[in-house]
């Protein structure tokens, strides 16, 4: 069975592909199967992805005050996907905020640029007190 971390990786990848304009309906099931994300974890990944897509505007509004001088459109797509996932989990799940931040940092190390882990940590750490 896939781990929660693998589910988060898949969600970030799906969010990235969605932002890049991929046709997600044909792609989601095949992608998750390829990553061996099945059963409950597949449902969790799809529900999280769909919820983030639906609430993207709300999540971005929560993020904006914590971006300092950075305009949300100037953030890398991978980093923005990780931030949206982190904000979504903080706001809509019961997962401990320290776990969410740690997972986001790990995702940033794996998928983002060199400065991504520090940036993601700073934004989510500042945000956690408000959530």
Swiss-Prot record:
GO terms for cellular component: cytosol. GO terms for biological process: DNA-templated transcription termination; transcription antitermination. SUPFAM superfamilies: NusB-like. Keywords: RNA-binding, Transcription, Transcription antitermination, Transcription regulation. The keyword Cytoplasm does not apply. NCBIfam families: nusB. HAMAP family: NusB. PANTHER family: ANTITERMINATION NUSB DOMAIN-CONTAINING PROTEIN, N UTILIZATION SUBSTANCE PROTEIN B-RELATED. This is Transcription antitermination protein NusB.
């Amino acid at each position: 069975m896939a781990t929660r971390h693998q589910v988060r990786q898949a969600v970030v990848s799906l969010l990235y592909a969605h932002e890049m304009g991929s046709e997600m309906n044909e792609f989601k099931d095949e992608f998750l199967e390829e990553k061996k994300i099945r059963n409950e974890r597949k449902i969790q990944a799809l529900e999280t992805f769909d919820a983030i897509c639906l609430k993207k505007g709300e999540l971005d509004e929560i993020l904006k005050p914590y971006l300092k001088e950075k305009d949300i459109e100037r953030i890398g797509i991978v980093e923005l996907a990780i931030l949206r996932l982190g904000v979504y989990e903080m706001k809509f799940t019961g997962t401990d905020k320290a776990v969410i931040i740690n997972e986001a940092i790990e995702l940033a190390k794996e998928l983002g640029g060199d400065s991504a882990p520090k940036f993601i940590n700073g934004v989510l750490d500042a945000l956690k007190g408000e959530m």
